[in-house]
């Protein structure tokens, strides 16, 4: 039995040769996410700054101009760095901060779910109400619209805007912060090799 276990463990250990694939996958997944977030902020900085600072319909953050620029540049620049695998542990820090701000300043009041699904775990009252509203919207669209055409690109959903995506990105960034960019396919790896 011990021999079987050792052989299985050896076979499993052989896969460590490809352990660079996990951080590479995280980087490739996160790069377009942060590129879109950062470039959208940069495309209209006056509106972004106003949203960061306005306490009535925005985030109500102090120093909105500074924080908006820091967030936008961290996200857009971070996307490029993640893609190249350059300074990944360093850029993970400000990106984690932006995710924490997103979680607590934007998404927290909406609960966990990003897309309202009353049958999923962590459904709050807002999500439970969304199911009834979605059913009514579908009835209206079936009666008064071309429902088949309207749903030909996908079904309708109600966006709940909960913390789910921001929390997921935070966990992914945490893994990159502690594990680094990975070997072989990252600039960090090759720079470290040159410095040794």
How would you label these PLM feature ranges?
Residues 1-46, 62-73, 77, 84-196:
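Extended, low-polarity transmembrane helix blocks
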Residues 49-63:
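Perimembrane loop-to-helix junctions flanking transmembrane segments
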């Amino acid at each position: 039995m011990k021999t079987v276990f050792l052989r299985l463990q050896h076979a499993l250990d052989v896969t460590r040769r490809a352990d660079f694939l996990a951080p590479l996958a995280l980087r490739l997944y996160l790069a377009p996410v942060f590129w879109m977030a950062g470039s959208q902020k940069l495309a209209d900085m006056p509106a972004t700054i106003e949203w960061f600072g306005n306490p009535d319909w925005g985030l109500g953050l102090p120093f909105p101009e500074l924080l908006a620029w820091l967030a936008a540049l961290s996200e857009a620049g971070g996307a490029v760095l993640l893609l190249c695998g350059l300074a990944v542990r360093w850029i993970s820090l400000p990106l984690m901060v932006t995710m924490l701000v997103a979680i607590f300043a934007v998404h927290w009041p909406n609960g966990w779910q990003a897309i309202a699904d009353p049958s999923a775990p962590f459904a709050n009252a807002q999500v439970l109400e969304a199911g009834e509203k979605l059913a009514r919207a579908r009835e209206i669209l079936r009666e008064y619209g071309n429902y088949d055409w309207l749903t030909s690109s996908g079904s309708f959903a109600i966006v709940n805007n909960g913390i789910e995506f921001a929390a997921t990105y935070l966990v992914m960034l945490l893994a990159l912060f502690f594990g680094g960019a990975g070997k072989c396919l990252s600039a960090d790896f090759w720079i470290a090799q040159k410095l040794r």
